Amino acid sequence: VNTTPEPAVDVPDVSVVPVIELPLPPPGTMGPPKEYQRLRQECPLARVRLPIGATAWYATRYDDVKELVADARLIRPSITDWPPRPGHAPGDEPGLVTMMELEGPRHAALRRALSEPFSVRSVRSGMPRIRRSADRLLDPFVAGDQPGDLVVRFIEPFPVMVMCDLVGIPYEDSDYFLPRADAALGAILTLEEGREATSQLREYITSLLDRKRREPGDDMLTRLVGECDRGALDHESAVNFGLSMLVAGYRTSTMFLADAVLTLLSVPGAYARLRDHRALLPGAVEELLRYVPVMNGVVVLQAVEDIELHGRTIRAGDAVLPVLAAANRDESVFTDPDGLDLCRADNPHLTFGRGAHNCIGSHLARAQMTVCLEALFDRLPDLRLAEDHRPIWEDESPSKSPLTLPVNW
């Protein structure tokens, strides 16, 4: 008789799921965190403690992330309503509600109003405008002293300039709205500053919409004013879109561009290969969007009803982080997922999400990266990392890009 005990069957129970610290990229790198592969294999739905003290479910497998980001039982909470704070009820403070948090008919109406300006056709026709913004920044950079800081002088202001031009926000106002956007995004930690900054940004967007009504332009805000005036869109949704652009319309692009350029300059021969073989660029952009691990648990969703996954119960009210960057490195989907393959043929990355809240600016993001790289190849063909100068990183953030990038050319 075999007396060897049978292995215990793992029946996970939410009450005993250990809480781990939020995985962070290794210091001085863009990442991704080393824990991703182990979590995908051993604990695809983990519990993590965020730097703000709250806990959340943390999904790292491609198939799970793909389903969760499109699951109607998960919504985007306002950053001023989540995580819950003692003595603070949802909605009792001026919320920073952006396009990402809108649901139902209001969200659908805003998406319809913006479908044309964010379409492939419109973005393609706008690429000369994007290139002019790149050249406007590169002209003084190329003429300047070496080494130069490519992030501070080009990559950081470039998406802001593009966003301002296309949306209809005066670029010269960036000194006003950028610090307030930082404060509004910090509302989770500093409620008073966040509340004041949010109020100021709302007033700024409202006044800008009024100005577009008096002085129409060739931009998205003017288009939304027209939609409001004919009753197809409510004023608050137009304000929400404006807030989206001020606080999120350029930040992720900046990080992707900085990490992408650093990657091409760090992988031997990659920059020169794309410079000399421009036909590879469309596929290379998709590979960089997959490879660059910016989306490290920055998408926070909240369950509106119970969800069962991997034998565990995500309760209504629980926060869920579908980790897009982890999904994009899933070895069950991508061959050599941790390698950069500029000719990768099959690349179903999830960087832009999917479902009702997939990134409406995905075509614009691709165009920005394409124009950014083309401009660098044309203007700085011998671009290289400066010797004895290392990029500076903000190592406490789950989403990282170099704050500085010293280069020679």
Predicted segments — roles?
Residues 1-409:
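Cytochrome P450
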